[in-house]
A protein has these predicted regions:
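Active-site-adjacent structural elements in enzyme catalytic cores
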Residues: 1-170
Length: 170
C-alpha cells in the first residue's frame, strides 16, 4: 500500500529505504512532480518505464543536488555546457553530460556515434534539494502516464500511479 507523506526527517528515511530497496518514490520538483528511483538500479529504472508506459527510447534524467556530484557519478559536462550550467543551474535547464568509463549509472544512453550521455538537472527548489541531499542523485521522469499531463500536485500523481509507487513525498 502506498503512502503520502510530508517531507520531514522520518519520511526522508522512509524514502531512502524505498530507494535502496529498488522502489519508486514521487517527489516534488521546481516544475512538476516526478517519479524517481536509484539511477544505478536497472530493475527500478525498468519499473519507471513500466508504470509510466514510457517508450525506452525516451531517456530518464538524473536529478542532482549540485553539479559537484557529476564527478562522483563518472560524468563530465563539456564546454560550453559547463559554463551554461554555472549560469542556469539550479533551474529548469537540463544539459547533457558525457559518461566516462567509470560511470555506474544504469540510465546512460548511447548516441548513434557511440558516445554515452546522460541528461542531468539541478532543480531550483529548496524542498527538492533537501530531498536530493538526503537521498543522493535520483533517476527521474515526470509523474504521469506517458502521453498524459504531468502531475502538478501529489494528488494528481497518486491518481496516475496509485499503488504502483511505494511512497509519495509532498
Amino acid at each position: 500500500m502506498s503512502a503520502v507523506r510530508k517531507v520531514n526527517e522520518e519520511s526522508l528515511a522512509e524514502a531512502a529505504s524505498v530507494i535502496a530497496g529498488g522502489g519508486l518514490v514521487v517527489i516534488p520538483t521546481d516544475t512538476v512532480y516526478g517519479v524517481a528511483c536509484d539511477p544505478r538500479n536497472e530493475a527500478a529504472i525498468d519499473r519507471i518505464y513500466q508504470v509510466k508506459s514510457r517508450p525506452r527510447f525516451k531517456a530518464l534524467q538524473v536529478l542532482l543536488a549540485s553539479v559537484d556530484q557529476l564527478d562522483g557519478l563518472g560524468l563530465d559536462l563539456p564546454s560550453p555546457l559547463n559554463r551554461l550550467a554555472a549560469q542556469f543551474l539550479p533551474g529548469a535547464f537540463s544539459p547533457i553530460a558525457v559518461a566516462r568509463e567509470d560511470c555506474t549509472l544504469a540510465t546512460v544512453s548511447a548516441t548513434p556515434q557511440g558516445r554515452r550521455t546522460q541528461g542531468i538537472r539541478v532543480p531550483n527548489s529548496a524542498l527538492t534539494l533537501r530531498i536530493l541531499n538526503e537521498l543522493g542523485p535520483l533517476a527521474a521522469s515526470s509523474a504521469n502516464r506517458s502521453g498524459d499531463e504531468s502531475a502538478q500536485t501529489v494528488e494528481e500523481a497518486v491518481q496516475a500511479f496509485g499503488d504502483d509507487v511505494q511512497l509519495y513525498l509532498d
